Curated annotation (Swiss-Prot):
Pfam families: ACPS. Its EC number is 2.7.8.7. Transfers the 4'-phosphopantetheine moiety from coenzyme A to a Ser of acyl-carrier-protein. Belongs to the P-Pant transferase superfamily. AcpS family. This is Holo-[acyl-carrier-protein] synthase. InterPro entries: 4-PPantetheinyl_Trfase_dom, 4-PPantetheinyl_Trfase_dom_sf, ACPS, Ppantetheine-prot_Trfase_dom. It catalyses: apo-[ACP] + CoA = holo-[ACP] + adenosine 3',5'-bisphosphate + H(+). It is found in: Cytoplasm. Keywords: Cytoplasm, Fatty acid biosynthesis, Fatty acid metabolism, Lipid biosynthesis, Lipid metabolism, Magnesium, Metal-binding, Transferase. GO terms for cellular component: cytoplasm. It is an enzyme of class 2 (transferase). SUPFAM superfamilies: 4'-phosphopantetheinyl transferase (SSF56214). It comes from Gluconobacter oxydans (strain 621H).
Length: 157
């Protein structure tokens, strides 16, 4: 079951200007240590694109949670890392993790799906939060849909 969905579009230059103006103060406030280490492997436009995608993913996740950056959800509570195959993954802590727990129905576990892309001047991210039954928990039977052939379509007119 889909619990939430969020999308964010970010101007890469907006992140670049914030980095130029505030430097490490901005980066340390917004991004986790792991996010900074990942983005700082790159230089120039690729570095800013990496930061902008992560910014967009944080925004999209906050929207999917239904909280925005309020009710105790902070930018640092949403971390973006890359899994073993390179695909982005979200790691929640603090207020974001608590919001996810409140959103997730009993007997279910949440799965966070994230997709990110950048094509200057933009960076984009989309987050979908879905719930699935916990392992070993019997879920309610799903409604079945029966599709009849169109042979009887004339009867519908």
């Amino acid at each position: 079951m889909i619990l939430g969905m969020g999308t964010d579009l970010c101007m890469i230059s907006r992140i670049e200007k914030s980095v130029e103006r505030f430097g490490d103060r901005f980066l340390n406030r917004v991004f986790t240590e792991a996010e900074r280490a990942y983005a700082d492997r790159f230089t120039g436009a690729a570095r800013m694109g990496s930061y902008a995608k992560r910014w967009a993913a944080k925004e999209a996740c906050a929207k999917a949670l239904g909280t925005g950056f309020a009710n105790g959800v902070l930018l640092q509570d949403i971390g973006v890392c890359n899994g073993p195959g390179g695909a982005p993954e979200l790691l929640l802590s603090g207020g974001a993790e608590e919001a996810l727990k409140r959103l997730t129905p009993s007997g279910q576990e949440a799965q966070l799906l994230v997709s990110m892309s950048d094509d200057p001047p933009f960076a984009l991210a989309q987050v979908i939060i879905q719930s699935v039954p916990l392992a070993g928990v019997q879920s309610a039977p799903q409604a079945s849909v029966r599709i009849e052939p169109l042979a009887n379509a004339a009867k519908l007119r």
